[in-house]
């Protein structure tokens, strides 16, 4: 391993915020796809650094960087060949250090992906393991003389991999892989493997990263007679990682990627009796496809049901909520019937399918319907958890289903209507992927520059919504209460944290809908619309009636009775009044 740099000085105690991730708005950005600083056609760390002012303006609190390590790039960088090296196309360790410092200067934290389950078959560890079975790396991977062990482990990539075992002609044994055959699984029963992973984590923590997204954690161990997922040994290793991080660093976060049912995922938070001793955060995978399902069916039950079946989590922990990311819209956590329904509704062209999912971006999934995009974004920002945006969704970027695998949702960021969308000065043929030139989603129409100039654009709307979320701690820290309501097409809930009470009402139907809600707990309060400041009628004993436009929503602050007098006059008017009084004195 490379020598780690000196750890940065910790922030003063008074500036610490150990649970910053609960309030944060996360933003996933592909280094390769964001901005090219040197004209070679590939995005890089310096290009990303140059765009930090934009991300700060947007309101991003934390960047999530998928793998930028040395890699053959057969799986978007998730086939890592050096966990402490930067892919030369992306820059150097010094470039990363400068990027990290520039992000921190702007108040933006950075978490990075760590692929613990597997490596590339080009990793020196695997090359040594296959060529010298009795050497120091001989047991770093899971080897077998036949391919019959662990028959209960499902094949994840059913459209490309016939088995979880692949024969290696050099070692003349089979090696185990839960993902692609070029990604052999590490053998965590070998103590040296765990030590090597923690050493790699320490390298990046010493550089100053604010945490990690732990990729594919349910599959670290294998045991006969099991499906090889969520095993006790996996949790023990995560506890070890958490202890290591907590004992040596402050305010760092571990975000778990476990595409499982919530009842299994909550185990990755650890022991609730001690406030959680594994991961601080975990993605809520099942809620994501059900948002799409609920809006298409115009029924709230897919969302309300999965949230009702989500167990409580430790107070210090948080869900990560997302709509889209760098992978396909995964349909693993739905029934076969629901999967067929989602494919029929959202992937009418076979090219839109990938593995057990849909390889499309948010805007095309929603037919570029602004009302639906805004509704989905409002749900993303308001549901219990921290929202994770995917780069380009704030401007409604499209996809390219003509590209292979998941590359269709990983095209270059569209900055301007100029050549290469302002992403790179390279010849178009040298770009890592072609820019989107679609008549609707293409860079000539959909780009940051044009939407920055238009204050009515999706970009400005998204920025305003992020600002509103930040002004109301109930969204990040508050409790969640599903209100039900008289109309099954309307999904209504309350987020509450201290005196901050927010009523969120969402019309999942394309038609205008009325709803009556039981709000007697806040009788006499006068709700205030958060975005425009409009006052609504006072709540009484009778059911509270609201009418919403098609795919419309309300965010209403419910002031407590003691707050009513203070909020009767808008803040701007109060300032004007005080100014005029002093002028006349």
What are these regions (language model features)?
Residues 1-580, 584:
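Active-site and adjacent substrate-binding regions of carbohydrate-active enzymes
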